[in-house]
Amino acid sequence: MVDERSTPCYCVTVANVATPTHPLTEMGFLSKKASTTINAGSSGGGYLSVSKLHDGGSVRFALLVAQPLEGYEAWGANVEGQSKPFRFDFEPTREDVIHELGEYEPREGRGGPGTVDVKFFIAAPVYNFDSGSVQVMSLTQKSIIKELDQISQMDDYDDLLAWDFNLSKKGAGLLTEYTLRPVPRKKGSQEHIDAAWIEARAAGFDISRLLTGGNPFKAA
């Protein structure tokens, strides 16, 4: 936690003088734009990548569906070194992964040579408050998935779609820790959330395309 130390302010009070405000700032030292730039993680394209949050960074989002897409995920790399995920709606064997990846080389699992790295995942469309748009959040981090599941089982949060969530990251590598916290819906945001979600669905959004390597936001 940052230790905020106050410093004395030597001021002269002038009556009836309006205080200028930063056009992008409601409160705080930094403008909204600067604060978002410093604190936000990667939200390029239509995906919210929580793993790319920097140490101390956070992101605020709202879930748009009551149930996520669930499955298993394996990553592979081709001869050019380009990597991409392959997803399954069942728990695949090593042979299943090798067959599905084709020319892509699967990542080695924790068991060493001869094993493949397969992880359980959930994915859901969310409204990212930083980008002001609908994005896909795909999670394999067990700690985040467990926290989300625990929150969903609390009586106070029986309707997860009525809440915002603040996800923060601390540390890096094997020492990474994530904290997920439900917070009240941001004032005045529901209209923007609804409009963005309606627009995404009208454009053909279908998250199940992740299972076939497609684009959830539009058909091929």
List PLM regions with ranges:
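Beta-strand-rich binding-surface signature
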Residues: 123, 164, 177
